[in-house]
Amino acid sequence: MKATLVNRVRSTIDPRDNHPYLNGAWTPMFEEWDAEDLGVEGRLPRDLDGVYLRNTENPVHQPLGKYHPFDGDGMLHAIAFEDGKAGYRNRFVRTAGFLAEQQAGRALWSGLAEMPPRSERPGWGAQGALKDSSSTDVVVHAGRALTSFYQCGALYQLDPRTLEQHGPAQWHGAFPAEGVSAHAKVDAASGELLFFNYSKQAPYMHYGVVDRDGRLVHYRPLPLPG
């Protein structure tokens, strides 16, 4: 196996912090790696060709107040299989919030459990005070891995094999101002992406469809009586 350290991000998390969601299996990592020709127990089928993607919450900075695991910065892990071999790489999702906090060298937004919010800048999502960490979900559509935020935000695009970053999805200028919630689904037969979003202002929810080429073809409000 050959492993290469690609990058190490700047972190301010106090190693003495004993929060259960910052330790043990939840201990964050701050390095980005490429690893080729991973060691294998047994044998990988040579016709196994594809990528396994896993999204995680991986906080970088000491929280502003109470911490919830949903607050962690998005990180993708990828294991690629080809010709009987496997390779690994991981990358932070370069969201607007992640980049702003890297520049500031500290947390700028408080999290889900901190009420009232202590965020120092306007936030994203239905609540409007949180960082869009794009750490909740990942789905592959139109050749791109799309990461998303549980309270509605941008869909950040990455190459599913290399994890090269391509910024927020634009959908040819038609991306909804209300954002997109996590847990969009892809229709395996049509290649369409099916999604929803929600907000505190009427209309409170929308449903939409994006075709296999990344064009928004359907976007309608859903009535929510009461």
What are these model-derived regions, one by one?
Residues 95-218, 223:
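Well-ordered mid-protein domain cores that form the structural environment of catalytic cofactors
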Residues 1-124, 130:
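N-terminal regions that are enriched for targeting/export leaders
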